[in-house]
């Protein structure tokens, strides 16, 4: 299985980078992991709704160009479906059983995801109704994917 994480924005803090590196290393036993970092647009303070929408659309174009045609796309969105860790594991497992070999998770920038990206998504996943920094969300997502594989393999980790 190939797992791709498409993210808007770069990680600047060393502790986030270390966590991403650790979970990437752990996941290498279970899947081929690719992390695609896309540049984010500068968001002016007090930007109008129109400007914010333009920024989301520019970022959205970059996201869509990074998604392979055969990918099953899972967009992280507040309005998505919340799953527990076992349900996420079952979802990934079922996709593999059904013949999906490429899952792409998408993490948007500070303004969220463009409508075009949400339309391209095969599934919308929410981790919470709260908003998280995209750097932290990347770590949380990778940890949950790692946990999902451990659950699938009946290996100790998940409690």
Curated annotation (Swiss-Prot):
S-adenosyl-L-methionine binds at residues 76, 108, 127-132. Keywords: Cytoplasm, Methyltransferase, rRNA processing, S-adenosyl-L-methionine, Transferase. This is Ribosomal RNA large subunit methyltransferase H. GO terms for molecular function: rRNA (pseudouridine-N3-)-methyltransferase activity. It catalyses: pseudouridine(1915) in 23S rRNA + S-adenosyl-L-methionine = N(3)-methylpseudouridine(1915) in 23S rRNA + S-adenosyl-L-homocysteine + H(+). It comes from Lachnospira eligens (strain ATCC 27750 / DSM 3376 / VPI C15-48 / C15-B4). Gene3D superfamilies: 3.40.1280.10. Pfam families: SPOUT_MTase. Specifically methylates the pseudouridine at position 1915 (m3Psi1915) in 23S rRNA. Its EC number is 2.1.1.177. Its main location: cytoplasm. It is an enzyme of class 2 (transferase). The gene is rlmH. It comes from the Bacteria. Homodimer. Belongs to the RNA methyltransferase RlmH family. One of its GO terms (cellular component) is cytoplasm. It is found in: Cytoplasm.
């Amino acid at each position: 299985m190939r797992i791709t994480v498409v993210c808007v924005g770069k990680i600047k803090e060393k502790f986030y980078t270390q966590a991403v590196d650790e979970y990437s290393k752990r996941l290498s036993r279970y899947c081929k992991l690719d992390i695609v970092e896309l540049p984010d647009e500068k968001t002016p303070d007090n930007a109008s709704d129109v400007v914010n929408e333009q920024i989301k659309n520019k970022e959205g174009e970059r996201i869509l160009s990074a998604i392979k045609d055969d990918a099953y796309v899972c967009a992280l969105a507040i309005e998505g479906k919340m799953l527990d860790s076992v349900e996420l594991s079952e979802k990934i497992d079922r996709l593999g059983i059904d013949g999906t070999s490429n899952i792409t998770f998408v993490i948007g920038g500070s303004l969220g995801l463009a409508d075009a990206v949400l339309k391209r998504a095969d599934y919308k996943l929410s981790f919470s109704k709260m908003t998280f920094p995209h750097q932290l969300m990347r770590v949380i997502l990778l940890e949950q994917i790692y946990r999902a594989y451990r659950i699938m393999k009946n290996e100790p980790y998940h409690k």
